[in-house]
Amino acid sequence: MISVGELVEKLSPHAGAIGGVFAALLLGLFLAFQRKEDRKVLDPVEWRSFKLVSKDHLSHNTALYRFALPRPNDSLGLPIGQHISVAAEIDGKQIVRSYTPTTLDNDKGHFDLVVKTYEKGNISRYLSLLTIGQEVRIKGPKGKFVYTPNMSPALLMIAGGTGITPMYQIIKSSLQTPGDATKLSLIYANVEEDDILLRKELESLRDSSNSRFTLYYVLNKPPSSWNGGVGFVTKDMIENHMPAKDVGDERVLMCGPPPMISAMKGHLAQLGYPAPRTVSKLEDQVFLF
């Protein structure tokens, strides 16, 4: 395809003949056509490679990885609430793990992954060792949950550790969408204060939400000056910091370590919520990522 520079070069010698206004009009039409060519680059079957362009350490064991898309106007093409598969060949075997980007499709030209590195985590360690310019292979979208504006009057979200990523994506999308009135509440549990991921971003969303989004942190090992929740997430915390259960068709979304999720199932059962399925479906009132 001809570039903008090539088009200008071709038009320049003839500008006097066809008129500067006409040349400008052609250039404007060309640029408009280019903008319409915004592409969604994900493929559910074919693995595609994307280059690492930056790495920002959020904590001692967690980083935000930014990968470039092929063109500045490209978007990933990921429905809100879904995730991607990341693959790598490790010790002669292809290893695949799922991650939810923290970027939305209106973030053009790149996508971001927030990943915690585990000592025995194959893909997380692989990502941590990537250098700028190296590539990863991904495909997608994957997942059963797709967020749409006003799909429920309230979303009650409980997250632990890196389980924050699908919640953050949903919260960010909801608050940026005109006409979406969904009430959003998040209980976010971690071990220590330094483990709280995307804290600045979450608090910025809360502060600009006109009280539509509430945020409550819980720490297992809090500092002496801590004013949030202490220990593990309890039934009382859910009752006190989630929207009132009488709002109607509210939904509960959960993502976190298995022991935490097991405990949350018990709390929710006591509060009258149905038991989640092993593999959650979009229509479920309690959805596990």
Model-derived segments and spans:
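Ferredoxin-reductase
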Residues: 37-134, 190-192, 203, 220-221
